[in-house]
Design a protein with these regions (language model features):
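Generic structural signal for well-ordered, non-membrane alpha-helical segments
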Residues: 9, 13, 103, 150-153, ...
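Short, flexible turn/loop "capping" segments at secondary-structure junctions
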Residues: 139-141, 197, 234-240, 302-305
């Protein structure tokens, strides 16, 4: 078992912990958590999740430690990752989930503290590799020390972009993610650097920015500069959907597009990552779904063979958290 620590016990940090602890075959052992929150509060928030339900086992705190089903996990409250006791706990991979240390230099503080590798749960600057599991995780090597797991939206978009670029080619495309609100927004109107995110999250549809489409170019260099997009935050707490429209390099049909996506979901590196859906579902149906991307085949459209539209759902919390675990597992195998 490879020992890992989580820095930041917020929405993603807690769900990464749930994913590790609920997947005994993942090869990872969670030995430490760093978070500035109170131990009792963290225990309660881990056990009782408004979106994903209760943890089925026992959760408590003792001193500063978290105890889950009898397993004791050391908890610290350090602001600077360089001061974390990674060496003392034998931590090999630091899972950086605060959302603050999102460049190679700042994330590298985990290495200074004794970790061997760092996986960042967000897009990051200057890192050794940006990974979307199922698309380019096979590019990971032992030389990649600080890695980004991209964003939840890039993890949804990249698999379908990969399949369709291989099958029919993508000349250029635009994506819109209709995205559930997140903690970056305000419950009621309040100052925020983005004046649209400053508005009450549960009362409006809120247009905002996303770099998810452009980030596909970091994962698939052949698509660099060919995709862009935007986001609309909506008043739901979880589950989002990517709406991709693109011009193919050759004429195609709806059946060909769906056939390519269906085949990729059934075998190869995207099996278990990409899901092909034939039922008329809605967002709540994907709450708790581990797939990165669930193609809504009923929504696929092709206009005159020259314009393609694809819709794909994703649990922006649970799916992404499981990809953190999957990518960390690949990194562990390279240590």
């Amino acid at each position: 078992m490879t020992k890992v620590a989580i820095n930041g016990f917020g929405r993603i940090g807690r769900l990464v912990a749930r994913a590790i602890l609920s997947r005994p075959d993942c090869g990872l052992e969670l030995v430490a958590i760093n978070d500035l929150g109170d131990a009792k509060a963290n225990a309660l928030l881990f056990k009782r999740d408004s979106v994903h339900g209760n943890w089925p086992g026992e959760v408590s705190s003792e001193g500063s430690d978290l105890i889950v089903d009898g397993k004791r996990i050391a908890v610290t409250a350090e602001r600077d990752p360089a001061n974390l006791p990674h060496a003392a706990h034998g931590v090999e991979i630091a899972l950086e989930c605060t959302g603050f240390f999102t460049d190679k230099e700042s994330a590298g503080k985990h290495i200074a503290a004794g970790a061997k590798r760092v996986l960042i749960s967000a897009p990051a600057k200057g890192v050794d590799l940006t990974v979307v599991y199922g698309v380019n995780h096979d590019k990971l090597t032992a030389e990649h020390t600080i890695v980004s797991n991209a964003s939840c939206t890039t993890n949804c978009l990249a698999p379908i972009a990969k399949v369709l670029n291989d099958a029919i080619g993508i000349e250029r495309g635009l994506m819109t993610t209709v995205h559930s609100y997140t903690n970056d927004q305000k419950i009621l109107d309040q100052i925020h650097p983005d004046m649209r995110r400053a508005r009450a999250a549960a009362m409006s549809m809120i247009p905002t920015t996303t770099g998810a489409a452009r980030a596909v170019g970091e994962v698939m260099p052949e698509l660099k500069g060919k995709l862009d997009g935007s986001a609309i935050r909506v008043p739901t707490p979880n589950v989002s959907v990517v709406d991709l429209t693109f011009t193919p390099k050759r004429d195609t049909t709806r059946d060909e597009v769906n056939a390519a996506l269906k085949a990729a979901s059934e075998s190869g590196p995207l099996k278990g990552i990409l899901q092909y859906v034939t039922d008329p579902l809605v967002s709540i149906d994907f709450n708790g779904d581990r797939h990165s991307s669930s193609v809504d085949s009923l929504e696929t459209a092709v206009l005159e063979g020259k314009l393609v539209r694809v819709l794909s759902w994703y649990d922006n919390e649970w799916g992404f958290s499981n990809r953190m675990v999957d990518t960390a597992g690949v990194i562990a195998g390279l240590l």
